[in-house]
Regions:
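Conserved, well-structured ligand/cofactor-binding cores
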Residues: 4-6, 13, 20, 24-333
């Protein structure tokens, strides 16, 4: 059922973005937008802009849009919200623009407008098109909330206002970290809930004797409860490792801009942005101790990936054991 829903979402995105097999839908009302490459027609109803429209044409690779991953879209919105508040606080962003930008980011973080995030997960650069997709959608939603028309960038500009004091190289990895943190907030409790279920079954079967095995051969006696208790302990350890690994995601390079030197970002901005992210996520987000290292290194992602892999291996092991234990019914293990 979930796959069917996702497929419907993908079809909805295709229609909303005005694309089918790479061909624009005919007779669709458009508005003209301009970038350094020239003018381009964008669907009038779209909240994205010219940069996203070009990316939709250039990067039809996997067929998997950003919208398929709501935590990532929300992570982009939360990151942009923190950046806007930090820029306003240090006097870089006109505070009159902040209110509609805040409302737009909050709406996207709550799940609205996700059908406008159609850029392919595989794209040129280090997330440049995804970053601009977020900038353009937030800008146009903010414009509409301020009573203006989409594309009225003299009032709120996707790059100058929404990407202020930022680069894709600090905004996108920070958004990814926020996305993983949001996912972890659901994954850890569910893992612990599964562990609790195994522990309850273990308590109910602690006196049932069975044969313990090594390499599938008879070894020494044990109880079913002992076996299930071990599975519960393994899951609890995996959940704790996820929590421990999450801490590797707390150091962000927002304010480092393109390579970590912080060029074109006001000096107080980085610390203020980290504080705003901490408020929005409820986590102790901090500025990375070395912004250049944090910009080129994937260490935090590798640490968290290892914890995810550990959980996957743990679940696979338990599932395999359950298959063997459920063999039979007359002459099984």
């Amino acid at each position: 059922m979930r796959r069917l829903r996702l497929s419907a979402t993908a079809l909805g995105l295709t229609a909303a973005l005005g694309l089918f097999a790479g061909t624009a839908v005919a007779d669709q009302p458009t508005r003209m937008e301009h970038d350094l490459l020239g003018d381009k027609a964008v669907p009038a109803s779209a909240y994205y802009g010219v940069q996203t429209a070009r990316a939709l044409e250039n990067f039809q690779i996997s067929g998997t849009p950003l919208a398929r991953y709501p935590d990532l879209v929300a992570g982009l919105a939360v990151t942009k919200l923190a950046a806007a508040r930090a820029n306003a606080a240090v006097g870089a962003l006109d505070k009159k623009k902040l209110a509609p930008i805040e409302r737009a980011c909050e709406a996207i973080a709550k799940g609205q407008y996700h059908d406008q995030f159609g850029v392919d997960l595989y794209q040129g650069g280090a997330g440049t098109s995804a970053n601009m997709n977020a900038n353009e959608v937030i800008a146009n939603v903010a414009l509409e909330m301020a009573g203006r028309k989409k594309g009225d960038y003299a009032a709120i500009e996707p790059h100058d206002d929404l990407n202020m004091s930022q680069s894709t190289n600090d905004a996108y990895p920070t958004a990814l970290k926020v996305a993983f943190i949001r996912g972890n907030d659901r994954l850890v409790p569910e893992t612990r809930r599964l562990a609790a279920a195994f522990r309850a079954k273990a308590a109910a079967s602690i006196t049932i004797l069975k044969m313990g095995r090594t390499e599938l051969q008879d070894a020494v006696p044990m109880t079913v409860g002992q076996e299930l208790h071990a599975m519960a302990a393994d899951l609890e350890a995996a959940a704790q490792q996820l929590l421990d690994a999450e801490r590797a995601l707390y150091a962000v390079n927002m304010g480092g801009t393109a390579i970590g030197t912080g060029l074109n970002a006001p000096k107080p901005y980085a610390a203020r942005c980290a504080r705003e992210l901490a408020k929005l996520t409820g986590k102790p987000i901090v500025v990375a101790s070395d912004m250049i290292a944090a910009t080129y290194s994937l260490q935090g992602f590798v640490v968290y990936s290892a914890a995810l892999r550990n959980l996957a291996v743990t679940l696979s092991k338990i599932a395999s054991d359950m298959i063997l234990l459920g063999s039979g019914p007359r002459a099984g293990l």
